[in-house]
Amino acid sequence: MTKMKTIFAVIFLVLLIPVLLKAPESEAKVYRGKCKSNLTWSYDSKTKTMVIDCKGDMPDDEQFYDLDMGWRKYYFKTKKVIFKKGISSIGAGAFYNFQKLEEVVLPEGLRIIKYDAFDGCRKLQFINKPSTLEVIEKDVFWDVKIKSISLKNLKKLGSECFSGAKLQSVDIPAKCKIEDSVFWNCKKLKKVTFEKGVKRISYGMFRETGIKNIDIPRSVAQIGTYAFANCQSLKKAIINEGVKKISKDAFSNTALEEITIPSTVTQLGKNAFRWESTEKSSLKKVVIRSQNIKKWGTMVFGATRDDLVIYVPQSKKAEYEKILRSTNGLDFHAKIVGKNW
């Protein structure tokens, strides 16, 4: 038994030697590399900080795991990335799935963040926005922890670029081209404001967010398909005069209790305010002020409550009631009342 203990002790010491000889954290190294002719990088293993020094456009990592781009070797360690001045665009997929990344520092002069650049960086919560930034391409900040970011001066937001992010509020710029589902599934998003002049709310723009109320400005002409679909905390929506088209499923499966359709509306899309659950819709009151609705989708207010009241222009009561009763699945007890606006 004593001999066995001695053997185990020797084995233990042999295994312990590498640990005893290991360099302390205070002697952590700085690793360096180069990519293409215009980019150098360094990684400090003590601070877990990556510094990118690039002149012009950063190379794309379209494979997402291109180890020729040496900084990718530290995707599971890097906590902070600093870009030095001189870079004009961040490459596609450049920091895809950097699992520990928490902070990004961007310089003035940066114009474009290309697609998937920070996609999957689920711990990323701190980032500044340079005044020169114009374009954020698709999927850039998918599922990150960022709570707020300025969108001022942006010219384009790519599809799903903030999908699943932890944003709490956004201010939508008037002159920015906004592609599909930009804020889809941002469950923490409660507040949205629009700069004067916004003309369109795009497809799925706020789908499945935590918005509780929304005021759509008169400059908006079209509310896109699925724009506010499945926003189950949305209890109040003001659609101002100026809106012409409310698209398919624009407000389907929300918690709206009443809604007013302004006089400028000419198109109501299929399922625009439909509740598709087995439970009845929350809508109790609908006011239709428009006398010029030319296109009606089916089931605009489908699966309604039995106490729903829809107010329509008196001059259009017969026409609108026929459409609503025949194509919209109103409860038998729902009332349609003519009003002289």
Where are these regions (language model features)?
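Consensus positions within tandem repeat domains that build extended binding/scaffold surfaces
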Residues: 91-94, 115-117, 137-140, 158-161, ...
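Bacterial N-terminal signal peptides that target proteins for export
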Residues: 1-11
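Short, surface-exposed terminal/edge motifs of secreted or surface/virion proteins that either
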Residues: 320-325
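Low-complexity, acidic Ser/Thr/Pro-rich repeat tracts that form intrinsically disordered stalk/linker regions
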Residues: 25-40
